[in-house]
């Protein structure tokens, strides 16, 4: 289905006459991460989405905010004639679910290990060294090498666009 100009992959199964359970995966995951869980609820309608940039869904062409993901989800659910779903989100998917629930009616919301505010983390020694080295003339050329050995696995595995989106999401605080 085309949503916000992107091909979005999803599966929709189970009892379509019952409340829809909408499953949203975490960063770097896809439908398969939630499929086993969704299969336990076949008495309900089950919708599992490959979020844009993951699985078989198209990658955004611009940096998407959490609001963009919420708008995409809302448009998808409207096209599927789903009102007041139960949203189950893991990590990144839970963050999207949290913001969705502040804008639209949901029957229930289940968030699993979902960040809702910017994490204040003490920088590791490696990160401090990288930041310092970037300021030293002649060492900037080592930045690419250093990032390969310092960044998170999710960051390393992401495309350039998804890295920008990841930074946007990590810094997005929805606690207010």
Where are these regions (language model features)?
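Conserved alpha/beta-hydrolase catalytic His-Asp/Glu region
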Residues: 120-127, 132-176
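Conserved catalytic-core motifs of eukaryotic protein kinase domains, centered on the activation segment
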Residues: 33-35, 57-63, 121-122
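Conserved HGGG/HGGXW glycine-rich cap/lid loop of the alpha/beta-hydrolase fold
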Residues: 11-56
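Flexible "cap/lid" loop of the alpha/beta hydrolase fold
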Residues: 95-138
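Short gly/ser/thr-rich secondary-structure transition/capping motifs
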Residues: 2-7, 29, 165-172
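Active-site loop/oxyanion-hole signature of alpha/beta-hydrolase fold enzymes
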Residues: 47-88
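Conserved alpha/beta-hydrolase "nucleophile elbow" surrounding the catalytic nucleophile
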Residues: 25-27, 85, 89-94
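Alpha/beta-hydrolase fold catalytic core
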Residues: 1-21, 42-44, 82-83, 107, ...
